[in-house]
């Protein structure tokens, strides 16, 4: 999977067992009381590859393997986060993810014969520091999102987004840079 080559996720016994283990941990996590922060942290430490301090994932949360996910410091996600981590998914520090977002490293061949064999590929996703991902955003395989970025709600991110930018749309495109004026609050303008 991590070699960015075609692999068989449907018939590989080890991968199937690893996905079941991750789904079990996600299920346990999603059943916890929202007040059980200690229980949440315990499961996330079992599930994720790396987790910085002050991380919060609001249930429900689902992933494929978990061990390919790395969270930086002060990561926060709202409800319904899905991370298909067949490839590495790395989040920097101070990343906020709004509800109903997905990070999808897995893809399938366009050629139906290979696709029907159960073959798929995975490309890593990287999100830099100080990033806000709006509600309903979907990030596709191989995307790199720079630091100090805002991705507008409902966007489908299919190409890299440079640092210090606001990007939105389907497909997601940079609409403007982030400037010093953005440090002013809306009521100061």
Range-by-range predicted roles:
Residues 151-154, 160:
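Conserved metal-binding segment of the jelly-roll/cupin
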Residues 132, 150, 166-168:
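Short-chain dehydrogenase/reductase
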Residues 1-54, 172-189:
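Terminal amphipathic alpha-helical/low-complexity segments used for targeting or macromolecular assembly
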Residues 146-149, 162-164:
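Conserved catalytic segment of ABC-fold P-loop ATPases
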Residues 161-163, 168-171:
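Acidic, glycine-centered active-site loop in nucleotide-sugar glycosyltransferases
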Residues 61-71, 76-145, 170-189:
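Flexible, glycine/small-residue-enriched loop-and-beta-strand segment within the central core
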């Amino acid at each position: 999977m991590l070699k960015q080559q075609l692999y068989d996720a449907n018939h590989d016994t080890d991968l199937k067992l690893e996905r079941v283990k991750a789904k079990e941990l996600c299920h346990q996590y999603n059943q916890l009381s929202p007040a059980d922060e200690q229980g949440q942290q315990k499961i996330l430490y079992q599930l994720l590859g790396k987790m910085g301090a002050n991380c919060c994932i609001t249930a429900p949360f689902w992933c494929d393997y978990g061990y390919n996910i790395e969270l930086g410091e002060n990561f926060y996600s709202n409800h319904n986060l899905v991370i298909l981590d067949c490839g590495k998914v790395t989040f920097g520090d101070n990343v906020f993810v709004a509800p109903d977002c997905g990070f999808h490293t897995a893809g399938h061949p366009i050629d139906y014969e290979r696709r029907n064999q159960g073959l798929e590929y995975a490309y890593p996703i990287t999100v830099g520091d100080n990033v806000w991902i709006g509600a309903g955003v979907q990030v596709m395989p191989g995307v790199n999102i720079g630091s100090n970025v805002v991705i507008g709600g409902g966007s489908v991110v299919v190409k890299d987004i440079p640092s210090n930018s606001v990007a939105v749309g389907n497909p997601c495109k940079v609409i403007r840079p982030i400037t010093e004026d953005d440090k002013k609050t809306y009521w100061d303008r």
